[in-house]
UniProtKB/Swiss-Prot annotation:
InterPro entries cross-referenced by the UniProt entry: Aminotransferase_I/II_large (IPR004839), HisP_aminotrans (IPR005861), PyrdxlP-dep_Trfase (IPR015424), PyrdxlP-dep_Trfase_major (IPR015421), PyrdxlP-dep_Trfase_small (IPR015422)
EC number from the UniProt entry: 2.6.1.9
Family label: Belongs to the class-II pyridoxal-phosphate-dependent aminotransferase family. Histidinol-phosphate aminotransferase subfamily.
Organism: Acidovorax sp. (strain JS42)
Cofactor: pyridoxal 5'-phosphate
Pfam name, any one: Aminotran_1_2
Name of encoding gene: hisC
Name under which the protein is recorded: Histidinol-phosphate aminotransferase
Signal peptide: none
UniProt entry keywords in alphabetical sequence: Amino-acid biosynthesis, Aminotransferase, Histidine biosynthesis, Pyridoxal phosphate, Transferase
Top-level taxon of the source organism: Bacteria
Amino acid sequence: MTTPSAELPALARIRDDVRAMQAYVVADATGYLKMDAMENPFGLPPALQAALGQRLGQLALNRYPGTRQNDLKAALAAYAGAPAGSAVLLGNGSDELISLVALACARAQATVLAPVPGFVMYAMSAQLQGLGFVGVPLTADFELDEAAMLAAIAQHRPAITFLAYPNNPTATLWDEAVVQRIIDAAGAQGGIVVMDEAYQPFASRSWIERMRAQPERNGHVLLMRTLSKFGLAGVRLGYMIGPAALVAEVDKVRPPYNVSVLNTEAALFALEHADVFAAQADELRAARTELLAALRAMPGIERVWDSQANMVLVRVPDAARAYEGMKARKVLVKNVSTMHPLLAGCLRLTVGSSADNAQMLTALQASL
């Protein structure tokens, strides 16, 4: 006889905080226009798709990943313009890298700090690894509250400070001088700063330029990127660049063979054709300009924030109603209005192709 899961004695062995959590569920989006996950709408051109398939088909899948990953690390370092003396760490998506940094720093009473609202994985990884989390609210315009950030760093002395550059879900790219002062303050008390550049293909600048120009001020900075927004969300490949000594310590808690031979080869193939993905990013930036203008001209939209990513944050009179109305019209967006008080009334819209954006705008207008 099977014991109902709610009565399983073994459940008592699961941590209380884990049992209180909700598992991440990907809803079935069949038949919907997906504008909720900041995915690149463009696939590979057919010729490249065929070439990639042929290349992957030649891999020895019966063998564990080997030194081919060193080729990928070198290619990523060259592509990103990694500073001298840096190293690259690969992850199964940037989510794994966030968890690895948290795990490497998981001492008693250690703290993670980040601006909020921000990427939810910073707080979740801290919780799962037993670190405290301190969220410092942004201003009403979703800019960094420099005084509050500096005060929080002085008070909590965080082991890790996460700065998303640009931020998710606000799509803001914060002032360089303010960011540098926060990095300086975190470093002055011995902390690590992780610059999360998941949306770098759509931003006007990268922190890696500062890391090259001022290595002495950024020697405690780890810069993290992903190929998801590059156009390979299905591949799950993140990478982290930073001082070799620091990267080597985080690498010690990485599971062996965490990145598959398929992911490695697909990433190398993508970098060999970086011009294709750069052209797609150019097209999306142009589409973003058009989308921002259309949203600002739309009656009923209360506010539209500037964007340095492939998403746009808007405030509407009733976010839940607008979300459900768009869903009924087969368009999925992200209702972020309950994620943080500063996001009240807000929806996060993915920047898609011109045709996708037009369909999304029509659904939004009809749902306000």
